[in-house]
Amino acid sequence: MECFGRLMAGLAPWLSLPDDNTTEGTHRKQLREWALKSYVNAVDPKSPDYLLWRQEGQTLVDAAYIAESFLRGYDALWTPLDSLTKQRYINEFTQLRRVDPSYSNWLLFSATVESFLRKAGAPSDTYRISSSLRKIEEWYVGDGWYSDGPNFAFDYYNSFVIHPMYIESLEIITEAGKHKNIWNMPGCDYQKAITRAQRFGMILERLISPEGTLPVVGRSITYRTGSLQTLALLAWRKWLPKELTNGQIRAGMTAVIERMFGNDRNFNEKGFLTLGFNGSQPGISDYYTNNGSLYMASLAFLPLGLPADDPFWTDAAQPWTSKKAWDGDDFPRDHRCRLGRWTCESGCGPAPLPGR
């Protein structure tokens, strides 16, 4: 479940592109058909591919990424499923209320599952959504960063989980709130959350070195390019702030991906990711890490959901900030983000409500 959910959460936008006659389009159509069959088998108790839905704890984490894949590819991956399969997912997601999430980013796993149930028209637990999002709002520490629980940690969980799932859950309840006021979430605001993510994206872009590396800090570093997810989300959803151009983000992210995967160290003889950061380095794995965990790396590929003629792909490549700085070229100054009025000293601002 861990491997499947994380992989699909990263690939859902690409699989949602319309069919075409290109080689890539043909390949994508085949993979989408296989994905849909996999979704069916994943909740069929009679299938050998039936996933471990009824386990404790970690199942909530892994199921949240499956729910996120449905949110990101609703029309292509959820809508085509037959009614029995949909009901099985609703039942399995509902069963996850037995899991008491830890006081950390895990709250967003509950919120994501329940937000998907609401989008799908199934009964959802309003309290599990609102209490989780209120707590995430309380944990905002400033300048685009949230703490992961009561204490701040300098790691990539703002990109692995917090910014994306907070925004995606807020998007669902913002849409629901248009019809009736059922939410008690002072301070939680969809546009403000996007503005914070824009600021975090600006910082993340500056962390990309001229050589295409990122600082190796924090836990779960084996998730590799999953650290780029917030930038990937901003690019895919057309939320990049004015300081970040399509050309520089594409070039910077590509540099990191090529530096990471441009060798043959990261896959074993069967083609699966190895435990490690850049190669087989099992000693850096955390106690909760297994080979399925590593497919968080696919979350960097969200921009593949943009069509080939999108400016993200067609704009000329440009140097990213650190490359300009270390090459002696002009580059913009950096300032902290003030969000009292949803503005940022660096210039990022609220995005349109809601949508692509």
Describe the role of every protein-language-model region.
Residues 1-23:
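N-terminal domain-start signal
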Residues 11-14, 28-194, 206-232, 238:
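Aromatic-lined, polymer-binding surfaces characteristic
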Residues 13, 17, 230-356:
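Terminal, non-catalytic domain-edge segments
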Residues 19-23, 78, 177, 309-316:
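Structured alpha-helical bundle/scaffold domains in large eukaryotic membrane-trafficking regulators
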Residues 35, 197, 201, 253-257:
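Short amphipathic alpha-helical coiled-coil/interface segments
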